[in-house]
Amino acid sequence: PKTSWEKCPLCQARIRKEGLKGDKEHSAEEKLQSYFVQRMEKVVNKHGKKMIGWDEILEGGLAPSATVMSWRGEEGGIAAASMNHDVIMTPGSEGMYIDQFQGDYKINPVSIGGFTTAERVYKYNPVPDTLAAAGKGHFIKGVQCNVWSEYLYNTDIMEYRIYPRILALSEIAWSPLDRKDYKDFERRLDNAQVRLDGHGINYYIPQPEQPNGSCNFVAFTDKATMTFTTNRPMKMVYTLDGTEPTPESTVYTAPFDITETTTVKIASVLPSGKMGKPRTILVEKQTLAPAKEVAKTTPGLDMEVFDGMYLSVNNLEAAQKTGKKQVIKTTRELTNQVPAPESMRGVKQYAAIATGYVNIPEDGVYYISSDLEEVWIDGKLMVNNGGEVKRFSRHDTSAALAKGLHEIKLVFLGHIIGGWPSNWNDGSVQLRKSDAEKFTPITAEMLSH
């Protein structure tokens, strides 16, 4: 907000009235924040209460009796404790944000991002060594995990985020350092999960994950080697005949090869016999889709723009064409036709469709990932994010593609679903060859029409 205060006439008037001036350490707007916090502190203290504030309250000068909640790393907490202020440690950089993912984001409910396992939470020490050495450790009054709710659309998802990481939080808050033992915590977690079952709590069970990003559609030309891991030691069972796995199904012990089109169903099993949600993975044998014979192309994609906000492609198909056409050099231009500020106030929404060719560099199976509404290759719908919160490309697919030009169609719908504006995405389409570890974006040099 301090950036907004620079343009706010009322804020600037208050700065002048109070004689607040910026210096080398703090801007006038930070001084305004300190003025406000200290003024509020007097109100709070008058009613027998004590102020607690996020570590931003350090900016501009700390209120005399305030307790600081250190969330932007530990630095704010260390600074406050060094000034003899009480501190609650809650740094996101150290795993104290348990609204973050705790498994592969490709197969988990959408989240704000980040990655924090129960092990990471458990291993955090809320009293930094620097404070302990300086005799200031007693100013750390507690530790907290945060669970922000913008992606908690129902109680089940909330519980899925919180448990079992909240159990790890309780132990780092109450257990002496010399008594902490993560392996023992894992053992006791098996028992705790039975108790959670008794209370009907929907806790996270690690799913079988594939290396380099999980995907529920695996194309291959010769054979596919299926490799799975879990981020906590866990039994995995699977079937290859389309039936649902049970605790007595074949136990996964090592990677296995598939040479014909097969449906793999695989799930984790707890010591209690309870199973996690099974994953269904279609493993399809394909021949290389042939490249197109095109006499002449020019760089970029043809793009048509439609004014207005469309929540689905069906709405877009019924829209009146505007005739707004242009050539774009990169897929990024699909999403940046209008400014997309953090507030999204006053944004004039639009949709866009881009068509042309993508040049595949060599024969192979490619995994395809994007946060756009749809990605089509050779007339086939590859990525469909319709109706979803468009973050973290959670509907990847794969295809066997020959070297050369392939038809591509990209669809962007500017709208807000689940609190996330699709305009904030970078419009990229990412490819990963099956023998590569990382996705790379389709570049301008690969696009033509």
Feature map (PLM): residue ranges:
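Active-site neighborhood of glycoside hydrolase catalytic domains
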Residues: 1-83
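Flexible, acidic glycine-rich loops studded with aromatic residues
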Residues: 50-54, 61-66, 72-224, 231
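Short, charged beta-turn/beta-strand-edge "cap" motif at the junction between a beta-strand
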Residues: 412-416
